Amino acid sequence: MSNGIVAKRYAVALFKIAKEKHVLEMFEEELRLVQNVYVKNGELHSFLTQPNISKEQKKTFLANVFGSVSESILNTLYILIDNKRIDILPEIADEYVVLANEERNVADATVYSTRLLSEEEKLNIAEAFAKRTGKDAIRVKNVVDEDLLGGIKVRIGNRIYDGSLQGKLARIQRELMKNR
């Protein structure tokens, strides 16, 4: 079974627990925290995937590092250790965020721009794209892309809205080539 399918199953289980306990937001924050530490800390990843370190040592280590997270998240980490699936932790977190966003009718957007956007600009973009996508809210993450000449690109899910200068020039070029 592919890692994506397995990750989705874990995410769905966590989502059901979170929904039952009314802690969707808290679980999301905790999963993002755990995911961030796991992805950015190569030593942690190496330790948790080392076959010569016992499962109990790994669990004790996880309890020390992530002792502040909820019992459900910590138990999920333990199960991942037991099933030798800790490597799919980032995918589980991503899948959980998708499920939680769907439940709240929220979307995450990555906005690529030539400079950091002000809070007001982010708010304006969020409002405009919330209307356009039919979502209640859009959470904006701004990424500076120095390759852009001007304008912005917005990525929501697997959809890209290209309002960049390069995008406009490419559309003009296609139109000119079509009219030849």
Curated annotation (Swiss-Prot):
Family: Belongs to the ATPase delta chain family.
InterPro entries: ATP_synth_OSCP/delta_N_sf, ATPase_OSCP/d_CS, ATPase_OSCP/dsu
Subunit: F-type ATPases have 2 components, F(1) - the catalytic core - and F(0) - the membrane proton channel. F(1) has five subunits: alpha(3), beta(3), gamma(1), delta(1), epsilon(1). F(0) has three main subunits: a(1), b(2) and c(10-14). The alpha and beta chains form an alternating ring which encloses part of the gamma chain. F(1) is attached to F(0) by a central stalk formed by the gamma and epsilon chains, while a peripheral stalk is formed by the delta and b chains.
GO cellular component: plasma membrane; proton-transporting ATP synthase complex
Membrane topology field: Peripheral membrane protein
PANTHER family per record: ATP SYNTHASE DELTA CHAIN
Subcellular location per the Swiss-Prot or TrEMBL entry: Cell membrane
GO MF terms, alphabetically ordered: proton-transporting ATP synthase activity, rotational mechanism
Known function: F(1)F(0) ATP synthase produces ATP from ADP in the presence of a proton or sodium gradient. F-type ATPases consist of two structural domains, F(1) containing the extramembraneous catalytic core and F(0) containing the membrane proton channel, linked together by a central stalk and a peripheral stalk. During catalysis, ATP synthesis in the catalytic domain of F(1) is coupled via a rotary mechanism of the central stalk subunits to proton translocation.
Keywords, alphabetical: ATP synthesis, Cell membrane, CF(1), Hydrogen ion transport, Ion transport, Membrane, Transport
Originating species: Bacillus cereus (strain ATCC 14579 / DSM 31 / CCUG 7414 / JCM 2152 / NBRC 15305 / NCIMB 9373 / NCTC 2599 / NRRL B-3711)
Single biological process term from Gene Ontology: proton motive force-driven ATP synthesis
UniProt cross-references to NCBIfam families, sorted A to Z: ATP_synt_delta, PRK05758.2-2, PRK05758.2-4
Coiled-coil annotated residue ranges, if any: none
Gene designation per UniProt: atpH
Identification of the protein by name: ATP synthase subunit delta
